[in-house]
Amino acid sequence: MGRTDRTPSADGGAGVSRRRTLRAAGALGAGLSVAVSGCLGGAFGGSRTLTVDYHPYYSQAFSALVIRHGELWEEHVPVDEVEWHAVLQGAPTVNRLISGDTDLGYMGDNPAIISAANTDTPLRVVGLSGYSMGQQGNLCVVADGADVDAPADLDGRTVNVTQGTLSHRFLLAVIDAEGIDVEIRDQEINAIVTNLREGSIDVAFGWEPSMSRVVNQDGAGRYLFTGAAYEEPDLGAMVMPDSLIEERPEVAKGWLKAELEAKHVLETEPERALDLGMREEDLSRDLDRETVHATLYEDLNVDGDAARQRFYTDFSTIEPARELLTETGPAFLREEAAVIDREPPADRFDSELLAEAIAELEDEVEWDPRQVGERP
């Protein structure tokens, strides 16, 4: 089954202005080299243990839970053990990838772009763990009773978000699109959930399944709008260091085969996928099965009829995902948010290994890996 480690996260937050938040977010990207200077290489090296950073509370990385609890990696990945390291947001995983403390990271689009832009350790985005037109990570939720009915009503208010995440990027995009001024308060996602449930904050941006816990499970809030209203997609991504891909290609490729199998389970056997995912103690302790099911399979219908989630893997065949990762996302993070000081080179977004995994898997399974691998 593998071991599990956890990186603790603070529960509190501090009120900061938009400008100070942007400056701090920029330091996140630019300061990575300071935090990990002198560290090179990957965690795998000559070891037979593969270290994987995953997010137990992130619906667009639910495939990782299916791989873990279904032990799907055992058939495809030539290692003796997988060490599972749980995180609550992508930024710690970016640091761990750069410092060589982990071999593979599941994360949202914002930290994935930051990973690809770093200049210390070559990292590649190798595939998607999930995709939607703003229905998973680009979510604005308001507490019950809050006098907020439209994006314009956010002007002059305090808005809560976890800094450095895909939801943070969406908030900045909304501010830019609406021409509003807000006070951004940086809070860890669990603190956001607690404060929305208690009514101590009015509005927050976040991701699933945490937002669904507030809205559906606890009945303490409502979705105000999503990324679909701004044609802002969101996605989960898998990031690997070049060292793993080049020195242990069968391990890297094998993991992508396991990912494809997990997507097949999610797409064709939803009850089995839920059975496996709910074995994650951190998830099942806080969320009921119905809530998790809703985040994966039940459309929000807040901004049109956008699908809740697509179980896609190859970003190169899904134009909005490709544009977000390689064009609009990096440009926004560099020019508007000052989070990165360069846009990632094109070779940092690599779908070739996934193509190889799909081709090989076609001869190994009875289902069509291209259905979950390539086609939108």
Where are the predicted features?
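Short, solvent-exposed loop/beta-turn-alpha elements that line the ligand-binding surface or hinge
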Residues: 71-79, 130-133, 228-230, 300-319
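Short, glycine-/small- and polar/acidic-enriched structural segments
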Residues: 46-177, 184-186, 202-205, 375
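Conserved C-terminal helix/tail region of periplasmic/extracytoplasmic solute-binding proteins
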Residues: 322-376
